[in-house]
From Swiss-Prot:
PANTHER family, per the entry: DOG1 DOMAIN-CONTAINING PROTEIN, PROTEIN INAPERTURATE POLLEN1
Species annotation: Arabidopsis thaliana
Note, other: The number and position of apertures is strongly correlated with pollen ploidy.
Pfam families: DOG1
UniProt KW NADP keyword: no
Cellular localization per UniProt: Cytoplasm
InterPro entries: Seed_Dev/Stress_Resp_Reg (IPR051886), TGA_domain (IPR025422)
A GO CC term attached to the entry: cytoplasm
Signal peptide as annotated in the record: none
Disruption phenotype: Normal and fertile plants with pollen having normal reticulate exine patterning but completely lacking apertures.
MF term (GO), any: sequence-specific DNA binding
Protein name (database record): Protein INAPERTURATE POLLEN1
Keyword vocabulary terms for this entry: Cytoplasm
Amino acid sequence: MPFSFFSRKKPSRRFNDFYEDWSKTLTENCLPLLRQSLSSAASASVLSSNVDLVLRHLVLYYETLDLAADHNTIPYLLFPSWRNSLETPFLFLGDIHPYLLTNLLRSFIDRENQDSDDEDEETSLDLVNQPLKMTMAWKDPSDELVKRIDQIECTMRLMVPGLMDRMRKTQRSFVARVSESWVSSYQVGKKKKLTATVATASTSVDEAAKIEMEELVSIFVDANRLRKSVIMDIVGATSEHQAALFLEGLCQFLAGFKDQILLQDFEILSLPN
């Protein structure tokens, strides 16, 4: 489809359908697989296989979006209208913030290694009903794991500001280039008929926008690459039981965005008094 900044067929419906199908698979297939894997009856091979399947589902999501990113779709991918108000605060360049991933991992470790006196009776009863490998998965993490988490977080602290800086520069350049092209085209055609003037200006703006759109596509793909690498690095750095627990927590968090009761409560709280 030819690129046009002012008139293009919105692909938001297509992305909405894709996201809904992906989320449904996450909730109805991935979560049950992981929970089955974390039961005492599951074998090591089942655990490993299901972790790989869920990881692939997450990675494939970003790969699909990367393939769909072009001049026409990038405005919708960076600012997805199909995301609800509960999801929006967690978005960074079109999808979940990479910091969320390591924060989730840290929360597992911190919760398990907090002072035992802080544990309530209900929590203790829950632990009794879980397989020993699950209850002890995050207890006293190895120095190697802690070091690897630090390295992942260090990489994010470098990459995230860099992506944000690229985004700001591209936006400034986009506004400057489009404004200049619009004014120049309008001055050239101001003695012509109004329709011809607008058409000439629109064409010039479209051409100017193409250049900046290419950089926006690159930024979006790089942001997805960071998200993918963080997820894969965490799974690679943890044991199979830890990886399964992390992916279960991540899937549960993402599935929670579709909880209609939670969404309704959030929207009520967001309303001005």
